[in-house]
Every structure is written in structure tokens, then in C-alpha cells.
Amino acid sequence: MAQPPDAAAAAAVPPPVVIDRDVWHACAVPYSGVLPGVGTLVYYIPHGHIEQCAEDPALLLSRLPDPIHPVPCTVADLVLDVDAESGEAYATISLLPGSHDDTTARRQVPAHGEPGFRFFEKQLSPADVTSNALVLPAGAEHVLPPLDIAAYQTARLFDVRDLRGKRFEFVHIWDKKRCRYMLGDLGVNDNDGWRGFVKAKRLATRDTVVFMRRGGGDGDGDGELLVGVRRAPRARGGHHPRPGVEDNKVVSEVWLAMQGVTPFEVTYYPREGTFEFVVSRDEYIGFSFSPFYPFVPGTTVHLRMNPLQIAQSISGTVRTFDHLRPWRMLEVDWDQAASPISYRIHRQVNSWQVLRQPQPAATTSAVRIRDAIVATPQVQIMALPRPPPPTTTTGMVPSDDSYAMISLFPGDCYVTHRPLPAARDPVGGQREFCFFDKKLSPSDAAANGGGSGALFVIPKPSAAEHVLPRIPDLRVTNLQGGRWEFGHTWSDADTDRRSSSHTLAAGWSAFVKAKRLCVGDTVIFMRRRPGGEPLVGVRRKPHGGMPVGIPDKHVADAWLDASSAQPFRVTYCPWQGTAEFVVRREEVEGSPPLAPGTRVRLLMNPDDARRRSQPPVYGTVRDVHCRSEWRMLEVDWDRDSPLAPTMNRRVNSWQVQPVQLALPPQGSDEEAAAATTSTAHAGDATTSAPSLALQLQTMASSSSSSAPIIPSRGSAFRIVNPRDGSQG
């Protein structure tokens, strides 16, 4: 009985092929194709998306606003499919702008296939494209239906489906004369076998065919045989045009992403010469901004491979690292002798695509057939090795570093202006908040270096007169509430108490060991008001004995919330060598343009009294990095300043002022003469309870580029991404 036309047409349509992650990774470029899970937090990088377009990426970038930053998103859906024209696998990723982290909703979609997945690949030579047979690489017989050579079976007919479901017939041949396996024709016409497959797929030299067996083992007829195609890069106008993403669609998707409101979809082709542009948040933040992964010239790196290509190892040496570029910021000289595909890898790669250490061994999983058919150790690249966590918490309790927690509202939504408690003039000739600091010498820190004891001698005794009471058993409290007891001695010179000397002996060695103080660290003694309890704090030198840092996740969370216009919180530590990254808006927008050769003066915090006694710091602008948003000025500081050796040459434009636009005088000459020296400071008076902001300014580094300027509640400001001197 004849079937109806519709039923016959439906029967002729091949059933679709389910593309799981194993098939996807086998068809993807070996160094690409990493897919995020549904529900994970990612960064969408428009530069990588634009790179897939057929037109010149630079021309398309000119149609978009500048600059274009990575956009934080959440993966809403992930669909794997095959291009109908080229046969290439691609992924459609649905993204939701902003942070919508739901750990319970995270899942691998689509999931991995059945155990026992095997595949081999072959890049076509000119002879493979023009001849009637394909010479198979070693190990192909473990994927294709096997031949019984002992029983003189030298040929076998089998069929295989492409990723669109279409069936092709091949002949598996054993060439006993040359001792090699081949894929041949049926000998009927030019449209069957290997020759027919080349014509149907319009294969060209340097294209790659991938044969896969999904499910089953090596037995006869076990599992499903599939064949995929990986196209080589081609010039525009060539004989085999490559399908791509429409330019207008890419532009609209970038605009939607930058608005941060409407969900959008992107299409990703894991082709040669391109990289994934939807990157996990942890990978992007950890490898682009983490201080544990500095890419200095000469560093040896290993290219990350997708999970099924881990048998290959490609290494290279870093030539340059441009942290200002959001895409392909790393230039690497690849070792072409180590891997046959090294010459096909672009020298410009992304920081999250390489690892500084060799890839460790792990469990055995899907096998990639190589020269030797053995169980290949595989590393799940999705589980990247993380840098060691810092020993300090957000509150910096182990290191005793002072910090500020600043709650921020994006935009101008918070208009109530509430300044912090201001300091008032001293009463009765004495200031209510007094302090002095001292940088530790080798003798001061001898207890931490293995010595039996140490003494803390105050070089200018007048500093301690209003801070340390004349008590033999001096009890001092640190900023975390811990109490310390020191043996305090002092000596008078005649009747002038300003010439007396103070020394801390007993208990000082235990304090040095407990705080792990090193030479160059600074100890600050403070007193809340005359007659109050003394306090002690620590200011660490750069890269001192205590590892300090803000976890990467805190920085990433703040970035995600800020990008989605949500309130967020940042932590600022006034360490030496860092600068405040929450800056008043009028300072950033009102900073004058500077040119190389301009004489500038470093701006100091006018509310910090200890700065008034220090001489101004002058310098000459050496270079201006216009594209940079952080530390865009390079300044040669005058060597006659005592702070010059500790100053960073790279500063921000709002941290300096041209000499021609001099600041108004900060107090009279008599006030400047009466100010205390750098080792004996008297802070501004506060209200009955001293402001924590004043304590933060006291704990700030005296040799930093500027004292910490804490924004008032409700003030408008800009938060700057500190890529050069990131605290996180």
C-alpha cells in the first residue's frame, strides 16, 4: 500500500542527532569550546563576539560606543546545534544581564554523553581532498568498525551519520602493502564513499573531519557512529564561504547587553582562531585581576585545552601583557616544536586561557585516540586550580590593618548629604586625639628575627608626652580589642619634659612575634583623648611579612551589583602604594588635562594635620596614557623629597595639580612651625567619641600617594577600577 505524500516525505527526513557536550567538545577547536553551565555567573565580552563577524571587527566596533566593557550576566539557557550550511557545531547562549546567582539552579545543559565516548580527527591535506581515499591516523580502527585481519577481512562497509542526521556509506580498508587503514569509495559512482562525502560537505584543504563513536565499545555494531566537520579559516570571497553571525544582530545584542535590562542571545562558533567570549566570572576575575597570577614577560604558560583535548600540551613564553585591553591582552610566543598545532594558535590570547603551571593528572574519562591507544589521563578544565586564599579576612583582623567599608548607590539616587563627624579645634592648647608613629628598625623587630629580645625606643620623646602616660606597667589595647602590657621606662632631662626619653622593653618582643612585625612596618600609638586609654595599630609595608588582600569574590560581587544598578559595598585599605578608588565626582571630572613635561604637585589630604609639616612633593609628567582609567599619569618625582623613593610613578590625574594652579595655604607659618614632626603627630580633635574616619587617616601610610579621603554620606563620586594597584 502506497504511503501518502506527506507520510513519505516525513519518513525521508532523517531523525535529528542529539548533540551532547562530548560531541560538542570533539568538534570544537582543541583550545576552545568551554561551555558555561545554566545558572552560572559569567562575563559577556563583546570584543570576542564581534571577532566572529564576517566584516572587519574594527569597522563594526566603530558603530558602537567607546569604551566597551565586559558585561556581567547569568546564563539562562544553552542550546547546542549544527549549522545547516557548513555542518559546524555552534552554541546559542541565552544571557540575563546582572547577577542572578542561584546555586540550586546550576546544571550542565546539555549533559555529557554515555561512558565510552571515543573519537579521532584528521586535518585534510591536498591529497586527502583530491583522492578517492582518506588515510586514517593511528588509532582510528578503535573508533570505526574493526576489521578481522587474521581472517583476511581487509574491507568492511559501514554507514555513519553526520550531525544533521544524514547518512553516508564508507568502506573501511586495510592496505596490507603499506600497513595502514584507509577510508575508501564503494566503486559505484563519484557520489558515494569518501569522494561523495568530500563533495557533499564541500571540504577543502586544512578542514578537519571528526569521527566519533558514542556508546558501546569496540565490538561489532556497538554504539552510534557520527561524523563532524571543523572548518579552517578562509579569506572572504573564497570558494567556500564560512557562515557567520550577522553584523546587525551582533550590534543589537551588544546594545542590549550594555543597557543591562533586556535578556539577549549570542551565537558562538568554536572555530579556529576564535575563543569563547562568554567566560565564567570566577575565571575572568581570578585570572585577569588576581595578584596571584601576574603575567610578566618571560613567564612560561600552558594553553588550556577543552576537556576532550587534554592529551595535548601547548606551552609558550609571555612576551607582553596589556591589562588595559579587555580582549586578547596577552601576547605569547608558542613553542612550535612541542605541539603540531602550535603554529595554528594566535599569539594574542586571553589571560583566562592559559595556566602558569603544568596541567595535573586526574581520573580517566573520555578517551581521545592518539598514536598510542591507552587510557589517557584527563583533567576537568572546568575545575581550575585556584590561588591560595589570603590569611586575612575582610576585616583584616590577623594583620591589624585599618580599613573602610563604603556602601554605594549607583547613579544619583541617594541625594541626602550627611557629612562624617568633623574634627574641631583643640581645646586648651591640647588636642583630644593624639598619636605618633615609628617605622621599625632592625633592632625594633629583632624578636621576629630570632633574637632573644627587642626594645622599642621612641626617637623623639616629645611625641609620647600626650600619648603614653607615665606608668611603669603600660597597658595598651589594639584595634581588635586585644590588650597588651609593656614595661615602660622614661627619663627626664632636667625639668624639660620635652627632652625626656621613652622606651618599651618587657612585653615588646611578644608583641612583635604575635603581630609578625618586620623591618619597615610601622607601629602607631594613639590616645582617644587626654586621660583616655592608649591604642596601638600596625601599618604594614608593601609585601611585608603578613599576606593581605581582599578576596576576589568581593570585588566581583561589587562589580556585578554596580553593573546592574544595585547598591553594593566596597572595602578600602589605605596601604602604602595604593590610592583611593572611590573618588568624588567633581575631582575626577574637574581634573585639568596634563601634557608631558608639566610640573605637578602631589595633592595631600587637607584634613590630615600630619601632612602639613611635610614638604610638598613635586614632579614632572613623563607620559600620559589617555586610554587608561586608572593611573593614567607617569610622573618623575623630584629626588629631594623624602617621600620620593616610596612613591609610585603611576598616579591618577586627580591626585596631582599643576604647579601653576597652586593650592591655597593650609594655615599660617606659625601653625606650620608649631606642627609636629613626621615621627610625632597630633591629630585633629574630634567629638566626644573620636571619629573612626580619623583613626583610618591615622593608620594610613604616610608615604602613600595621598592620605585617604573618605567620602561623605550622600556625596556624588565615581568608583574607578584599579587594575594597576588592585587591592583585591
UniProtKB/Swiss-Prot annotation:
Region (Disordered): 665-728
Coiled-coil portions: none
Protein name: Putative auxin response factor 20
Organism in which the protein naturally occurs: Oryza sativa subsp. japonica (Rice)
Main subcellular location of this protein, as a coarse class: nucleus
Record-level Gene Ontology MF annotations: DNA binding
Location(s) in or outside the cell: Nucleus
Covalent S-S links between cysteines: none
Gene label: ARF20
GO CC annotation, single: nucleus
Species lineage: Eukaryota, Viridiplantae, Streptophyta, Embryophyta, Tracheophyta
